[in-house]
Amino acid sequence: MKIINILFCLFLLMLNGCNSNDNDTLKNNAQQTKSRRKRDLTQKEVTQEKPKSKEELLREKLNDDQKTQLDWLKTALTDAGEFDKFLENNEDKIKSALDHIKSELDKCNGKENGDVQKNTFKQVVQGALKGGIDGFGASNATTTCNGS
């Protein structure tokens, strides 16, 4: 019986020694796994960045008034691909068109039928831009509001 007790104690000591090494190994593996996950997440974030659209790139270069007019123009150009075609133009031409739209819409602010006239101007802009941005301006895209 003494021999069995001694062997049992030795077995427990050996088992305890193996567990302590395994615990350290498990901790190291857990830390390595965490660092791998962090590395994988940062790599996914880098690859998930989408290239910016033409509209986003243009918005970075516009002032606040021009951004507002771009939003307005986006609602005016409702046909498929019309707004995208507009964005393909030269940046300076787009900016001057947006400034012209702002100046025309400002004429309608505070007027009695301003909202109706702005909606009419939307249709005018839509028709004027069908011919391209080169002819767009005071000659073919004006509001019916009287400037004061």
UniProtKB/Swiss-Prot annotation:
It comes from the Bacteria. Residues 40-61 have a biased composition (Basic and acidic residues). It is a lipid-anchor. A lipid is attached at C18 (N-palmitoyl cysteine). Residues 1-17 form the signal peptide. GO terms for cellular component: cell outer membrane. Residues 26-61 are annotated as: Disordered. It holds the Pfam family Mlp. Keywords: Cell outer membrane, Lipoprotein, Membrane, Palmitate, Plasmid, Signal. Induction: Induced when grown at 35 degrees Celsius. InterPro entries: Mlp. A lipid is attached at C18 (S-diacylglycerol cysteine). It is found in: Cell outer membrane. An outer membrane protein that may participate in pathogenesis. Some human Lyme disease patients have antibodies against this protein. The Mlp proteins probably undergo intragenic recombination, generating new alleles. Belongs to the Multicopy lipoprotein (Mlp) family. This is Lipoprotein MlpH. It comes from Borreliella burgdorferi (strain ATCC 35210 / DSM 4680 / CIP 102532 / B31) (Borrelia burgdorferi). The lineage of its organism: Bacteria, Pseudomonadati, Spirochaetota, Spirochaetia, Spirochaetales. The gene is mlpH.
